[in-house]
């Protein structure tokens, strides 16, 4: 999955001044209904959390994943990750659906959306 994403240039890596990976995102420009940007993964190494790196990665996603006709952004977040859900809400994303047992039995996933502009 990530190899394909790298070839498609849909992976963005946050590096420090020593070229050390701090985190990354993987997204699809037409991932939802073949029309809307979808964020597959945003990950920040634990020791680099709370420094704004996640916010910077999200900004990159929103600035680069959409085309001029895209009006919405989408992502999913698992119920066991309330910190990420809170970050997305603070960035303007709203929960538009719940997907029970989506990735794994007993784990709910929230579909979140943000309107552009």
What are these regions (language model features)?
Residues 1-47, 55-60, 64, 115-116:
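Acetyl-CoA-dependent GNAT
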Residues 38, 69-71:
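Short loop/turn motifs at secondary-structure junctions
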Residues 57, 81-84:
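Conserved short alpha-helix immediately C-terminal to the canonical SAM/SAH-binding motif I
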Residues 71-74, 78-82, 90-91, 97-117:
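C-terminal "cap" of GNAT-fold acetyltransferases
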Residues 61-65, 73, 84:
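Short hydrophobic clusters on alpha-helical segments that form packing/core surfaces
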Residues 52:
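Conserved G/P- and acidic residue-centered "switch" motifs that form tight phosphate/ATP-binding loops
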